[in-house]
């Protein structure tokens, strides 16, 4: 979903949305609980119709007022479903196909877990398993489940994240993510940093937003061996990525554009993506939207191109109940000119609490 810049005082980061239920509020300590059930009934090409979990969650937020604008905060988010990997093997035991089965309610697990401090008018500093400010970059994705081209370091299990308060519509921040394995002999896969700036301004019915981010992280790359060995060997390489986006809105109409590019050191070719989204709010409850994505990846002479078009309609039965219908048509064309189609249609329900 699209990330929106919200004009809030930073001390309110520890507080929750309007959907939250406050279960404790005494002596400067506040605890809120909220969440949402997100289900999609969908049909993809070459698959049967399926009912899947689209990120259902329950979150617990706590804050304690330390005085003089300073507060301590903590956040935990639970999810309920995890995909299960499946391998199809031939009679010789060789893997011929791999895919994931989308489960529903099969695995309760902690998705986010972090704590930190907020200082009113300055910003928040948090430590733990969390989204980084890189996840906030992107303005063109108005869909519920079919698009998005964010290529930045957007989350980390062991992350330190800073996000400033809003200054005249401008917000900035950065994050550092540690590698999963601290052993000096282990690969540094996932370790990196991200910086980003966000600007949002509204004058009457006209709104403008601009966002940009840059990140570097280590990624695991297989080492080519000659002759090929039975045991695969991997090494660290750096992936550098940037993303910029802009949005122009007037009353209920909004047009967003994002561009993303990434490159892995010592690997030929870059990955480039352009996304254009259009959203129109018919009224306070209903909206229609469309989204276009163009992607290109690979070295010269071996480039793969992807094209995706998505359209949808969303309707709020209640301020906390959303329904939608969405469809997308994807085309992937390899360097030999072979085209693979990937179409999907779905209808969904989100109940917030």
From Swiss-Prot:
The keyword RNA-binding does not apply. Its main location: membrane. The keyword Transport applies. Keywords: Cell outer membrane, Disulfide bond, Ion transport, Membrane, Porin, Signal, Transmembrane, Transmembrane beta strand, Transport. InterPro entries: Gram-neg_bact_OMP, Gram_neg_porin_domain, Porin_dom_sf. GO terms for molecular function: porin activity. It comes from the Bacteria. Gene3D superfamilies: Porin (2.40.160.10). GO terms for biological process: monoatomic ion transport. One of its GO terms (cellular component) is pore complex. Structural rigidity of the outer membrane of elementary bodies and porin forming, permitting diffusion of solutes through the intracellular reticulate body membrane. This is Major outer membrane protein. It comes from Pasteurella multocida.
């Amino acid at each position: 979903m699209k990330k929106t810049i919200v004009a809030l005082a930073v001390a309110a980061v520890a507080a929750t949305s309007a959907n939250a239920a406050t279960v404790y509020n005494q002596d400067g300590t506040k605890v809120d609980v909220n969440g949402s059930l997100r289900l999609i009934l969908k049909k993809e090409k070459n698959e049967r119709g399926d009912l899947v979990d689209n990120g259902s969650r329950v979150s617990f937020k706590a804050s304690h007022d330390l005085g003089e604008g300073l507060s301590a905060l903590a956040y935990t988010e639970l999810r309920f479903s995890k995909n299960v990997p499946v391998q199809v093997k031939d009679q010789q035991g060789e893997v011929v196909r791999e895919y994931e089965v989308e489960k529903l309610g099969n695995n309760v697990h902690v998705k986010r877990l972090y704590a930190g401090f907020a200082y009113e008018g300055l910003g928040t500093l948090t430590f733990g398993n969390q989204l980084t400010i890189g996840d906030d970059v992107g303005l063109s994705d108005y869909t519920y489940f079919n698009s998005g081209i964010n290529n930045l370091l957007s989350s980390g299990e062991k992350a330190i994240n800073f996000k400033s308060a809003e200054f005249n519509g401008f917000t900035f921040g950065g994050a550092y993510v540690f590698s999963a394995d601290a052993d000096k002999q282990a690969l540094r896969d996932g370790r990196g940093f991200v910086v980003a700036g966000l600007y949002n301004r509204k004058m009457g019915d006209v709104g403008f937003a601009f966002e940009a981010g840059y990140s570097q992280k280590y990624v695991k790359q297989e080492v080519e061996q000659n002759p090929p060995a039975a045991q695969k060997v991997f090494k660290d390489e750096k992936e550098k990525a940037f993303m910029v986006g802009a949005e122009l809105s007037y009353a209920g109409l909004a047009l967003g554009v994002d561009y993303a590019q990434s490159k892995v050191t010592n690997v030929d070719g870059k990955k480039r993506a352009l996304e254009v989204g259009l959203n129109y709010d018919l009224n306070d409850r209903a909206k229609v939207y469309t989204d276009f994505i163009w992607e290109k990846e690979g070295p010269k002479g071996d480039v793969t191109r992807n094209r995706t078009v998505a359209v949808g309609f969303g309707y709020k039965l209640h301020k906390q109940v959303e329904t939608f219908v969405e469809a997308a048509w994807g085309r992937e064309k390899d360097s030999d000119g072979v085209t693979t189609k990937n179409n999907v249609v779905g209808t969904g329900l989100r109940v917030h609490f």
